[in-house]
């Protein structure tokens, strides 16, 4: 018989740097998960992606065991890194926070393709371009 799912917890953690301190501790500790075990497994899986923010969905079962799925970094994080800025524009349509090239957008779209609801690379690029514009980034050729 399958294990009963008690909770699904969504977290965004820096790759290879999960610790039992907040936000991991409070989110998973109250569900009875072994925090050190989660941190070791997460850090091992994401060790090659150092410096990236990785969304993770942790499924907790009734016997206190867990599984987790890592996703690709958020598009906004990747766009900010590509444009070399700390935050998007406070007034996206009026103030330009930075610039990204179509080549950078293509690279981000290729990376995000598995998590996006897009059939091809062109559609994925349009989604990423929309995110860039809503952050106040200018898309240049």
Curated annotation (Swiss-Prot):
InterPro entries: Ribosomal_uL11, Ribosomal_uL11_bac-typ, Ribosomal_uL11_C, Ribosomal_uL11_C_sf, Ribosomal_uL11_CS, Ribosomal_uL11_N, Ribosomal_uL11_N_sf. PROSITE patterns: RIBOSOMAL_L11. The keyword Cell inner membrane does not apply. Pfam families: Ribosomal_L11, Ribosomal_L11_N. Keywords: Methylation, Ribonucleoprotein, Ribosomal protein, RNA-binding, rRNA-binding. Disulfide bonds: none annotated. One or more lysine residues are methylated. GO terms for biological process: translation. It comes from the Bacteria. Part of the ribosomal stalk of the 50S ribosomal subunit. Interacts with L10 and the large rRNA to form the base of the stalk. L10 forms an elongated spine to which L12 dimers bind in a sequential fashion forming a multimeric L10(L12)X complex. HAMAP family: Ribosomal_uL11 (MF_00736). Forms part of the ribosomal stalk which helps the ribosome interact with GTP-bound translation factors. This is Large ribosomal subunit protein uL11. It comes from Fervidobacterium nodosum (strain ATCC 35602 / DSM 5306 / Rt17-B1). The gene is rplK.
């Amino acid at each position: 018989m399958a294990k009963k799912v008690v909770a699904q917890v969504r977290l965004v953690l820096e790759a290879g740097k999960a610790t039992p301190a907040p936000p991991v501790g409070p989110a998973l500790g109250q569900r009875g998960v072994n925090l050190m075990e989660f941190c070791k497994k997460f850090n091992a899986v994401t060790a090659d992606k150092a410096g990236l923010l990785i969304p993770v969905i942790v499924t907790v079962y009734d016997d206190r065991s867990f599984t987790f799925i890592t996703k690709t970094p958020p598009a906004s994080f990747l766009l900010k890194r590509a444009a070399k800025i700390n935050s998007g524009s406070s007034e996206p349509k009026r103030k330009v926070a930075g610039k990204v090239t179509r080549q950078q957008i293509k690279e981000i779209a290729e990376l995000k393709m598995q998590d996006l609801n897009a059939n091809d690379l062109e559609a994925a690029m349009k989604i990423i371009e929309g995110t860039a514009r809503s952050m106040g980034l200018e898309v240049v050729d």
